[in-house]
């Protein structure tokens, strides 16, 4: 069994990116800049944005965090986004979710200029993903999953990939990326009947449902590759959506939780920020 070590891989990728950014600065004088916006005092959001800020600093990307009070109106947030859209020194914009309930998340996502939409959530980027447009900013977690498969030499072409979960953030985009990578893709969701009959056929199984230990050993084919996107808190520990201990001995490769997909998400955010800067300055 191969352990797909996202933590180690992300370190290697960030080292490569640091070199690329240094070279880009020497050639153009440009240092990519990411602006992250937090609305309210959600501790998890602050922690997550803080880790993004540290990652930016480490590779040589400028970053700024704008923290707005919980009472910020939707209009005030949209006006700030407009200002950042027009600021040529800002290459990438991120609005940390969740937002307060009085703010329409969709309106906020749509307001970000597609070329600065570092999370890849804007409809223009979703459409570009379908069309395999090279200018597409791909959603960070799905992009990280495909990078892991590639870096570990796991063939997607002709493979049967089963994705459990159909969210806009992970399930749908990773299904499309796998399809773009020439896999045959089955996407399962809460209305899928006889889930086990699908998962046991998977050469590559991606699980993103937010339920600890949801995928058990009898649901996985011998020799499969399992990508566990889940992050769940159980008895003070972080666990995935897959019963890791039960599944690990029958698979060819598997991601651990923590230390699997998670670190790759922030790494791909850094790569997307660099992509934003390159596209905006062509």
From Swiss-Prot:
Enzyme Commission number: 1.5.1.5, 3.5.4.9
Binding residue positions for NADP(+): 165-167, 231
InterPro entries per the UniProt record, alphabetical: Aminoacid_DH-like_N_sf, NAD(P)-bd_dom_sf, THF_DH/CycHdrlase, THF_DH/CycHdrlase_cat_dom, THF_DH/CycHdrlase_CS, THF_DH/CycHdrlase_NAD-bd_dom
Pfam families: THF_DHG_CYH, THF_DHG_CYH_C
GO cellular component: cytosol
One record GO biological process: purine nucleotide biosynthetic process
Alphabetized UniProt keyword annotations: Amino-acid biosynthesis, Histidine biosynthesis, Hydrolase, Methionine biosynthesis, Multifunctional enzyme, NADP, One-carbon metabolism, Oxidoreductase, Purine biosynthesis
Gene3D superfamilies the record matches: Leucine Dehydrogenase, chain A, domain 1, NAD(P)-binding Rossmann-like Domain
Domain of life: Bacteria
GO MF term list: methenyltetrahydrofolate cyclohydrolase activity; methylenetetrahydrofolate dehydrogenase (NADP+) activity
Pathways per UniProt: One-carbon metabolism; tetrahydrofolate interconversion
Known catalytic reactions: (6R)-5,10-methylene-5,6,7,8-tetrahydrofolate + NADP(+) = (6R)-5,10-methenyltetrahydrofolate + NADPH; (6R)-5,10-methenyltetrahydrofolate + H2O = (6R)-10-formyltetrahydrofolate + H(+)
Family per similarity comment: Belongs to the tetrahydrofolate dehydrogenase/cyclohydrolase family.
Function per UniProt: Catalyzes the oxidation of 5,10-methylenetetrahydrofolate to 5,10-methenyltetrahydrofolate and then the hydrolysis of 5,10-methenyltetrahydrofolate to 10-formyltetrahydrofolate.
Subunit structure: Homodimer.
Protein name (record): Bifunctional protein FolD
Organism: Francisella philomiragia subsp. philomiragia (strain ATCC 25017 / CCUG 19701 / FSC 153 / O#319-036)
């Amino acid at each position: 069994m191969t352990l797909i070590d996202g933590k180690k891989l992300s370190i290697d990728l960030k080292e490569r990116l640091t070199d690329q950014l240094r070279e880009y600065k020497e050639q153009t004088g440009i240092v990519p800049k990411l602006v992250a916006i937090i609305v309210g005092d959600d501790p998890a959001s602050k922690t997550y944005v803080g880790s993004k800020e540290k990652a930016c600093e480490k590779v040589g990307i400028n970053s700024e965090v704008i923290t707005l009070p919980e009472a910020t109106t939707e209009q005030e947030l949209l006006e700030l986004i407009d200002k950042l859209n027009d600021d040529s020194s800002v290459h990438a914009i991120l609005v940390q979710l969740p937002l307060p309930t009085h703010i329409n998340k969709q309106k906020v996502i749509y307001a970000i200029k597609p070329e600065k939409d570092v999370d890849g959530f804007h409809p223009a980027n979703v459409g570009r993903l379908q069309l395999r447009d090279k200018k597409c900013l791909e959603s960070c977690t799905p992009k990280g999953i495909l990078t892991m498969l590639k870096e570990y030499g796991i063939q997607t072409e002709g493979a049967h990939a089963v994705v459990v979960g159909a969210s806009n953030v992970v399930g749908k985009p990773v299904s499309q990326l796998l399809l773009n990578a020439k896999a045959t893709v089955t996407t399962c969701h809460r209305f899928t009947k006889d889930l086990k009959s699908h998962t046991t056929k998977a050469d590559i199984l991606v699980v993103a449902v937010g339920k600890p230990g949801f995928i058990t050993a009898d649901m996985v084919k011998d020799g499969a590759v399992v990508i566990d996107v889940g992050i769940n808190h159980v008895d003070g520990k972080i666990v995935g959506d897959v019963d890791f201990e039960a599944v690990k001995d029958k698979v060819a490769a598997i991601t651990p939780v923590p230390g699997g997909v998670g670190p790759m998400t922030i790494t791909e955010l850094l790569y997307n920020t660099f992509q934003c800067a390159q596209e905006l300055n062509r």
